[in-house]
Amino acid sequence: MTFEEAINSIKELNIETMQKAQKRLDNLTKPLGSLGRLEEIVKQLAGITGELFPCVKNKKIVIMCADNGVVEEGVSSCPKSVTSSVTQNFLKGFTGVNVLSRHSRADIVVVDVGVDDDIDCPGVINRKIRKGTWNIMKGPAMTRNEAIKAIETGIEIVGKLKEKGVNLLGTGEMGVGNTTTSSAVASVLIGNDIGEMVGKGAGLTQKGLINKIEIIKNAIDINKPNPSDPIDVLAKVGGFDIAALTGCFLGAAAYRLPVMIDGFISATAALAAIKIKPECRNYILPSHGSAEPGNKKIMEALDMSPMLLLEMRLGEGSGAALAFHIIDAAVAAYNEMGTFGDAKIEQYKPLE
């Protein structure tokens, strides 16, 4: 499915199924609305899938991995080589997202869309667009065509997972320097001051943070991304990982799959996807409130509330893996609770 085909495939939620789901929720043995946001989650899943009893047993977290040329400006406390190392470590099973996803009965899908290394690791899907983006302090991160190619990579990966019966997606990433590119993209798309968006990432000093803010400001001045054109923003100050995750969100909406935001980087991709196609928002669920300040600004801009507030800033899809437990609980309660008829109890009626 091409970028244009995906955009044209995104439709509104199935309102009829959502109404039926609400009717069932109101008939479960509990006070009306007493499961709070769990009820909203189930209704959203019903609207996305068109199924009155949605299934979320086949879960995958897609991790897009890429390097960023801006790292040469000293915006990260980690060397660029960490991107390649962690990308390969995902397949060894001992990273944070590995552990958390195992406990939520989810698998990870690792995609190399731009790691600056020749990765020969069984299990890493090679969709390398280029070995890292260009330095945004010297010009655009990528060409417009490369940005679209990265987006289409995300769409492609989601389509293949849909064919395999996956029914719940999480999003994750790995890329040294990607909080810098995310801050740049998000600040342009939202219109916020850079200082409100930028955090310390993987552990910058205060001096490093000040440098990071200046680098982002200068990169935006140099490249002049168009806030009304999300693809232009991704191409000029983004990264291959962000663009590919943007494709994951668009692809999920096109294939009618529920998809979860992880932290700041994937929230930036979700923001870009929604700016491209506003209806995409209906298919997206937030997971946790990242400790990165820009994440809160994105959640506010999208009018979303994270399910979990744990001060995490790991990335990788770790927050999505944790929030899968909430989704499982919501679906289990909805599917397995008895009705008032089962319990021979008079149904609650709304108070006037």
From Swiss-Prot:
Q: InterPro entries, alphabetically?
A: Nict_dMeBzImd_PRibTrfase, Nict_dMeBzImd_PRibTrfase_bact, Nict_dMeBzImd_PRibTrfase_N, Nict_dMeBzImd_PRibTrfase_sf
- Catalytic activity annotated for this protein? 5,6-dimethylbenzimidazole + nicotinate beta-D-ribonucleotide = alpha-ribazole 5'-phosphate + nicotinate + H(+)
- On whether Transferase is a keyword of this UniProt record, the answer is yes
Enzyme Commission number(s) from the entry = 2.4.2.21
Which keywords does the record carry? Cobalamin biosynthesis, Glycosyltransferase, Transferase
SUPFAM superfamilies in alphabetical order = Nicotinate mononucleotide:5,6-dimethylbenzimidazole phosphoribosyltransferase (CobT)
GO biological process assignments: cobalamin biosynthetic process
Question: Keyword Magnesium on this protein?
Answer: no
Q: In which pathway does it act?
A: Nucleoside biosynthesis; alpha-ribazole biosynthesis; alpha-ribazole from 5,6-dimethylbenzimidazole: step 1/2
Q: Name any one GO molecular function.
A: nicotinate-nucleotide-dimethylbenzimidazole phosphoribosyltransferase activity
Query: What residues make up the catalytic site?
Result: E316 (proton acceptor)
Matches recorded under Pfam families:
DBI_PRT
Q: What family does the Swiss-Prot or TrEMBL record give for this protein?
A: Belongs to the CobT family.
**PANTHER family xrefs:** NICOTINATE-NUCLEOTIDE--DIMETHYLBENZIMIDAZOLE PHOSPHORIBOSYLTRANSFERASE
> What is the annotated role of this protein in its UniProt record?
Catalyzes the synthesis of alpha-ribazole-5'-phosphate from nicotinate mononucleotide (NAMN) and 5,6-dimethylbenzimidazole (DMB).
The name on file for this protein is Nicotinate-nucleotide--dimethylbenzimidazole phosphoribosyltransferase
Q: What species does this protein belong to? A: Ruminiclostridium cellulolyticum (strain ATCC 35319 / DSM 5812 / JCM 6584 / H10)
Gene name as annotated: cobT
